[in-house]
Amino acid sequence: MVLNNRQPVKNTEWIAVESLKSKISYTALLIYNERSPKMPASYFKRKVKAISVKEKSISQLLAEMSETAYQGRKLGEAVDVWEAMVKEKDLVIIMGFSGSMSTAGQWKIINWLIENRYIDILVSTGANVSEDIVDAMGLGYYQGTHYSDDQELLKADVNRYYDVYGKETDYREMETLMTEGLMTLRKDYPYTSAELLYVFGKYLNKKKVDSIVATAAAHNVPVFSPAITDSAYGEAFLMAKNQGHPIILDQVKEFDQFVSIGEKTKNVGVIYIGGGVPKDFAQLLAISVSPRTMDEGVPGRNGHLRKGLKEYYYPHKYAIQITTDSPQWGGLSGCTLEEAISWGKIDTGGKRAVCYCDATIALPLIVHALNERVKIKRKAPDLSWLFKQVS
């Protein structure tokens, strides 16, 4: 043996040196362990499980993804939370449905959720519950490209939704049908959007146009659209008015009607596809105070009292959010469910999942997994009382 290129040493000397080095290392390790914080076993309860490629259902794949990481894990967890909602008794499930998803082929998924009562209330942009009518009329949308020459599309009367094309003539035909339907409504009655869309949905059912609001009306599922005029409905309201048939919308009555839902349920679960007005409207149900229950709270509900204000709030027990927006810009679409806890809108002990993903990817996968996984028929709450005045 040679140490540091010096004179050879005997094996016994080499062993002694190595033994000394080992003792020094062991002593250093003991000192490190004594001075370092102990790592709790709770950090290591659930191992990440690698996904094996084999034939499997969507439900099984998402179950395996929930045991991995990043947004794949969150997508799998979203299925778990939704499944728990469906299986819980005395729960109202509200979906906030933002953007222009119907033009992207998502509207029949919403119909299925309504028919099977995996949602009890839909809060939607006007776009989602109007642009689906084009497709339901048999007209449809077409795959295009976002590299289009938009000036040429304008000349050809083609409307572009990112990589989807729609005919302007089809849109006008939808608006005409919508106007005809709205002109069957009473001129002297102040409608909420839920009442209006219920009556209009019945009209579409008679026309065999199986859109979202038609399906909802057939199953007594309320559809609220707080910003309904920001869509083809706004155009249809104007056209009806110009033909001597003005429609009255009462947004204060609408909000009071929505808040009253919280007085007739034990717990609430929410699913947000995107954010915007639909999300905020549904979130307000947790904290909005009705004069009817201001002093003593809602009987039968586990409310929390803001002692300084002497007001009750009722955080949503379950929550799912599918979004591509980020929280640091301050907008509601990217606002985390954890931030909503500070407002009293989301239950600190409830089940929740946030997945940052394009909804056209997440929604079909989640709903197909639910279809495979949940075998019980849900006993859904009866919300037909909301339509009592217009039935």
Give the location of each predicted region.
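Short acidic, glycine/serine/threonine-rich loops at helix termini
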Residues: G105-K108, I133-L139, G234-M239, A282-L285, ...
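N-terminal glycine-rich anion-binding loop in soluble enzyme alpha/beta folds
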Residues: M39-V86
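A generic, well-ordered mixed alpha/beta core segment in the N-terminal half of proteins
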Residues: N111-E173
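C-terminal functional extensions of proteins
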Residues: G297-S391
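Ligand-binding beta-strand-loop-alpha-helix segment within the catalytic cores
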Residues: E152-Y233
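Glycine-rich anion-binding loop/nest that anchors nucleotide
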Residues: I93-S102, L122, F224-I228, P246-L332
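Glycine-rich phosphate/diphosphate-binding loops that line cofactor/substrate pockets in enzymes
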Residues: V79-V92, T215, S260-N267
